[in-house]
Every structure is written in structure tokens, then in C-alpha cells.
């Protein structure tokens, strides 16, 4: 599911993916409490599975495959802690980003040879690399975060252009003003990035600095501060910018046209559907509320911190108390630090939220009811908006190649896609993630609904994927292995 290399960084990137996320959303403007999935007019079609269910573990200790006609092999080791994959559209090579070791390239000529491209300091003298994406022209955009005076974060987006010697030359596309850190694992910072299909702008995720909109004052350095203008948003930046400064001021950001969408908690990974729609996985809070898949559109608000899926954040209500809240577990960090509490100053909801994609199952649809019981929304013929809590969705990749088998492709009415789950770091819901889902997305009104079918499981915190024709490359954060799954 949504922050590397300062003192807390290694733990934070794991939490970042776990806690995420990009895009909490709902179309309900009232503050009526909603603690279980809402029955709607959404049609629940028959369960859709791509092919016959099997279970095999072709490589001892490796992932289990759950559908016939899929093979798997390890093609490279990218080192533990690698966080991003990106395909160079000019050369076809696969690039690997690691916050510690920098940028490497895996040759896609069948050799899968991995070679160093740049050290972190070649890209940015001072900072932690956290995301990357190629433009259609081969320009590479890298996101980084750096700590300023120990209590602020500054995000930087660097642009690399290959020179005649084949070496990336780097310049700063944009950087933020320093903004307050919370000094908690919920400092998600800037990370996910994607380039528009025409190459004219980049979309960049800035995760929240809170778990669920609570005050995080960083040892009284920022009394009363929750999320700020530079957090919990998707930004859009022209690719022809240079040294653009992004102020920590909402009105100024709006005046510059830099805000694309609001209310995303940590949209760590974004991808374009075949029709050009931009979708992203978003990580829910450190409580048993859903993670999300959102269709990102300019000007929309996706609910954070007032909504998680289609459910209300209870802390916004004056009578809330964490005592007896069955959606909290003692092993959640937010619980351990007392982030769930009575909060009479919680900001009033602006309403007008956009719902996440509805998940019809059969998989990744577990939810926690208000009484603490675990339920399966698909078995109850209810949509879940979108995934089981704590799955931390990321590595979204759409299936478009004619070389992909028909049952793993979309048709005139649907889009096929794959999405990974980093996996639960706490709680006791039976769905623990660390798997690969096949999604079949269908446009319904002004949003999408999807089926979700588990096709592989027991990765080791998978963090990103790239689809090349009928081969899906999956990066395991825990092992550094790059797995190649081939669909026949």
C-alpha cells in the first residue's frame, strides 16, 4: 500500500506503503455515520475468475500461483529496499530505484543483466529518493524528500535527460517550501509520480502527515497542526518547468494551478487506464477501514480525513472515544501513540466527496463491522469501497497487449489490470495481502466498479510491478527479487 532515508526512513517506507495510499473518496456530503458497507444500486454480477483455480509453488520459498497457465521465475536481484520499477519507453529497459543504492537498469534483451546507472548523490546531493517515472520522450523524473532543520520536509522533483554519452544529466523541475513533519510513521511525504500521456505534465502524490487527520504537533513544535497545504493531495506540474517553487499555501497553490486533486491519504502508485483515465491505490488509516482504488479527476476531493472508503472517520464526531472502538487493535501504531482520541476541534467536513471504486469481490473484500466482527462483503452481496483494510494496494498495471490471454485482458466494456498488496502490518483480519490481484474494471455511471481475483500470494512485501506484453515483473521489497510472471 503510501518515505525513505532520514533517521526513521527505512521503517517509514514500510509504513508508507502499509499506511497509505492516494485516494480516499465518497460522494456523500452529510456527516451521517456509516460503519459498514452501504447497499447501493450497484449490480453484483456473478463472480468472475479468469480461469480454473489451481495452487502451485513452482519455486521453493517463492510465491504460490493460483491460476492455471501462469509460470514464474526469478530474473534478477535488485537488493532489499528497492522501491520502484519503471520501463524506459525509448530502450525498453527496466529501471530500478533504491533509496540507498540509487538507480540501476535491467537489460530486457533476455540477459536480465543489472547495471548501475546513478548513485543517489548523482541525482540529488541531499535527499531520499522515493519515486520515479519515465515520460514518453525518455525523460526520467525522480521524486525525493529531504529533512530541513530536523522538523521540516522539503520535496524535490528532479528531471533527467540522457546526453550523447548515454549519461543522465539532472536538473530540478520543482521543489516545495519546507513544511512541518509530524515525526511519526505517518509522514508519508512525496513519493508516487506519473507522467501524463502527452508528456506535458507530471502528477505527483503528496501523502498525509497524519494517520487520520489528527493533530500532530511534533513535540509541540507545531501546535494545532494537522495536515497542511502541501500534504494529502495530488499535484500537477508542467514538465517544462525549472526550479518551480511550490508554496505551503493552499490559495497560492490553487492560483498556480498546481493542485489536481484533494483528500488522498497516500496514493503511492498511479497508472493510466487504456482510455486515459488516471487511477491510483490509496492506503487507509491505522484502523480497520478500507484501503482504496480511486479514479483520479481534476478538482475532485477523495474524502481524507473525513471518509475512508464509504465509511466515516469517527474522530470527526464530538462524542467519539477510542475506548471500545472495535476497529482499533493494540498493535496499531496509531493506537499506541494515542492518535485515536476525543477530538472536539476536528475540522468540519466540506462534503462533496468522490467515492472510490466499488469492489465486488470475490477477493480482498473483508471488512470490520462496528461490533468488531469480520465480514465478507461479496458473500453478503455488498460492494466494498475498495479493499480489505491494511492491504496497502500498489503496483497497479493495466493489461493491454494482444499477447496477453483474453481472460486477462479487457474487452469493449471492461479494463483488465493487476494490483499488488504490500500486506498487513497489524490487526487480525484474515486477509493479510502480500499478493497479486487481477481486476476487471467496468465503468458504472460516473465511476468504476471492479471484480478482484487473487492469482498469486505469499510475496515478501511486493512494492511495484511493470507489465511488458504478457509478462508481469514484480519487485519484492523484502527480498529484492524481481519475479517474472508469464501468462499463457
Regions found by a protein language model. Give the residues of each.
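Short beta-strand-to-coil "C-cap" segments at the C-terminal boundary of structured domains/repeats
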Residues: 160-162, 237-239, 296-298, 484-488
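Ser/Thr-rich, Proline-interspersed low-complexity disordered segments
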Residues: 26, 31-59
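N-terminal secretory signal peptides that target proteins for export/translocation
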Residues: 1-14
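Sec-dependent signal peptide recognition
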Residues: 15-23
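Acidic, Gly/Ser/Thr-rich repeat motifs that build Ca2+-stabilized beta-propeller blades
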Residues: 48-214, 278, 389-444, 471-486
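Beta-propeller domain segments
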Residues: 48-65, 208-258, 264-266, 270-451
Amino acid at each position: 500500500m503510501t518515505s525513505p532515508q532520514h533517521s526513521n526512513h527505512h521503517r517509514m517506507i514500510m509504513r508508507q506503503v502499509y499506511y497509505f495510499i492516494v485516494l480516499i473518496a465518497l460522494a456523500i456530503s452529510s456527516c451521517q455515520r456509516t460503519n459498514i458497507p452501504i447497499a447501493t444500486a450497484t449490480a453484483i454480477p456473478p463472480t468472475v475468475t479468469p480461469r480454473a483455480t489451481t495452487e502451485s509453488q513452482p519455486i521453493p520459498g517463492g510465491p504460490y500461483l493460483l491460476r492455471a497457465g501462469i509460470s514464474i521465475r526469478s530474473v534478477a536481484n535488485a537488493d532489499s529496499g528497492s522501491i520502484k520499477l519503471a520501463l524506459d519507453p525509448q530502450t525498453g529497459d527496466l529501471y530500478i530505484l533504491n533509496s540507498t543504492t540509487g538507480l540501476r537498469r535491467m537489460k530486457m534483451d533476455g540477459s536480465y543483466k543489472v547495471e548501475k546507472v546513478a548513485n543517489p548523490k548523482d541525482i540529488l546531493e541531499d535527499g531520499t529518493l522515493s519515486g520515479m517515472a519515465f515520460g514518453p520522450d525518455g525523460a526520467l523524473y525522480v521524486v525525493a524528500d529531504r529533512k530541513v532543520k530536523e522538523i521540516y520536509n522539503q520535496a524535490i522533483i528532479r528531471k533527467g535527460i540522457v546526453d550523447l554519452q548515454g549519461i543522465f544529466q539532472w536538473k530540478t523541475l520543482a521543489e516545495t517550501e519546507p513544511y512541518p513533519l509530524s515525526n511519526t510513521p505517518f509522514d508519508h511525504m512525496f513519493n508516487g509520480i506519473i507522467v501524463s500521456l502527452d508528456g506535458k505534465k507530471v502528477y505527483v502524490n503528496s501523502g498525509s502527515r497524519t494517520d487520520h487527520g489528527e493533530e500532530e504537533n511534533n513535540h509541540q513544535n507545531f501546535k494545532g497542526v494537522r495536515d497542511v497545504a502541501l500534504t494529502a493531495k495530488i499535484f500537477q506540474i508542467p514538465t517544462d518547468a525549472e526550479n518551480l517553487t511550490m508554496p505551503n499555501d493552499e490559495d497560492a497553490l490553487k492560483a498556480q494551478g498546481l493542485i489536481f486533486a484533494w483528500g488522498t491519504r497516500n496514493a503511492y502508485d498511479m497508472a493510466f487506464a487504456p482510455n486515459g483515465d488516471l487511477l491510483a491505490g490509496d492506503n487507509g488509516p491505522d484502523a480497520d477501514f478500507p484501503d482504496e482504488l480511486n479514479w483520479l479527476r481534476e478538482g475532485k476531493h477523495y474524502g481524507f480525513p473525513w471518509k475512508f472508503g464509504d465509511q466515516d472517520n469517527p474522530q470527526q464526531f464530538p462524542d467519539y472515544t477510542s475506548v471500545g472502538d472495535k476497529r482499533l487493535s493494540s498493535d496499531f501504531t496509531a493506537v499506541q501513540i494515542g492518535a485515536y482520541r476525543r477530538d472536539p476541534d476536528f475540522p468540519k467536513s466540506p462534503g462533496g466527496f468522490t467515492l472510490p471504486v466499488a469492489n465486488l469481490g470475490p477477493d480482498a473484500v473483508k471488512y470490520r463491522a462496528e461490533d468488531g466482527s469480520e465480514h465478507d462483503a461479496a458473500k453478503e452481496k455488498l460492494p466494498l469501497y475498495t479493499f480489505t483494510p491494511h492491504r496497502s494496494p500498489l503496483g497497479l498495471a493495466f493489461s493491454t497487449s494482444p499477447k496477453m490471454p483474453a481472460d486477462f485482458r479487457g474487452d469493449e466494456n471492461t479494463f483488465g489490470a493487476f494490483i499488488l498488496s504490500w500486506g498487513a502490518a497489524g490487526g487480525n483480519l484474515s486477509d493479510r495481502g502480500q499478493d497479486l490481484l487481477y481486476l476487471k474494471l467496468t465503468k458504472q455511471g460516473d465511476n468504476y466498479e471492479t471484480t478482484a481475483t487473487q492469482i498469486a500470494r505469499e510475496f515478501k512485501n511486493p512494492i511495484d510491478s511493470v507489465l511488458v506484453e504478457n509478462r508481469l515483473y514484480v519487485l519484492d521489497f523484502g527480498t529484492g527479487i524481481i519475479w517474472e510472471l508469464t501468462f499463457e
